[in-house]
Amino acid sequence: MIGMDHFEREAYEDGYRVIAGVDEAGRGPLAGPVVAAAVILPHGYSHPEITDSKKLSAGKREKLYEVIKRDALAIGVGVVESPVIDQVNILRATLRAMAEAVDDLSIRPDFLLVDGLHRIFLNISQKTIVKGDTLSVSIASASIIAKVSRDRIMEIYHRQFPQYNFLKNKGYGTREHREAIQNFGFCKIHRRSFKVKSTKPQSLQTVNLFDF
């Protein structure tokens, strides 16, 4: 079994010096943004608890979020909201969020480890890794940053639209959420391209990622 730093070590051996892991959260929900994160960790970094954010409890993710913020050399976050998702489709929106996350880094990486199958539209050497959040500490760290950042955005949206209980479902298509859509229609952050019946939208206030 390979270690969580295998792909990082491989990149260092190939001569790269600044490696960023990139991952996203929120491709599947019916509402809210897709959020991506890019994380540059120190050379040789490891942490026994850092893994795919989906395998962690909310409390554990929050604790590891603070650990990663403390230990990382640089963190970048990209957010693409639902109107853009509807306009360009979820895959392109995800890749756009990933590119924004890399551009948001305070240090320019020379190599990217990207979760999934698709390369980011940036002129930087990169390797895509299916299930990379379980195989790379850099990608796993990015998955935690992306997930916690998105959850916090959805908590803000919950205060604007409490009838959908975004605090609990984070925009995913739970039974409760679908029933709320049937009862209240769409609000402004719902993804119209995700085939959920639309009624009159409500107003939307802008969410600032740095409000939390």
From Swiss-Prot:
Keywords noted in UniProt: Cytoplasm, Endonuclease, Hydrolase, Manganese, Metal-binding, Nuclease
Gene Ontology BP term (one): mismatch repair
Chain coiled-coil ranges: none
UniProt keyword Manganese, yes or no: yes
Pfam families referenced in this protein's UniProt entry, alphabetically: RNase_HII
EC numbers: 3.1.26.4
Swiss-Prot/TrEMBL catalytic activity: Endonucleolytic cleavage to 5'-phosphomonoester
Name this polypeptide is given: Ribonuclease HII
Gene expressing this chain: rnhB
